[in-house]
Amino acid sequence: MRTGELGIYLSSLELYCELLKDSRDYYVICEDDVFFTPEIRKISSIVNNCPEDWDMIFLGTNKEYCKKENSDRSYSRLTGKCMPGAFGYIIRKKCAQYFVNFGFPMEEPIDGLFMRNFENLNVYEYSPNCVFVDYDDKSTTIHNSDEV
């Protein structure tokens, strides 16, 4: 695992622990290098219109790996065949507790942990994208950092 991936993993689990103590039911979590689309203003609507059983809602898709982009507002259930990208998502308290319980030992980046557990959770991808990452931008440090 790279140092940047380790940092995201640990800070994500720290946020999940904070959510468990918070009165809110969910957090919106984004990496620091995301770009927002106007769709981000609709977070409350996205949450309220998602199927009631949701645990996580991914807000952006890495088109390199998930070749689906829909201009209609829609929710797609994720099954573990595709990881949209952990750069922007909404996580419910129940799901945060799940990852706090099963997040250690750290064996892979956080998105690998997510994908490996899609079958145990109700995970959706919202379209169109609310956030995206410019993978061509050399300023991102996640994939350019040293191995731990």
Describe every region a protein language model picked out.
Residues M1-C30, V34-V148:
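An acidic/histidine-cluster motif and surrounding catalytic segment
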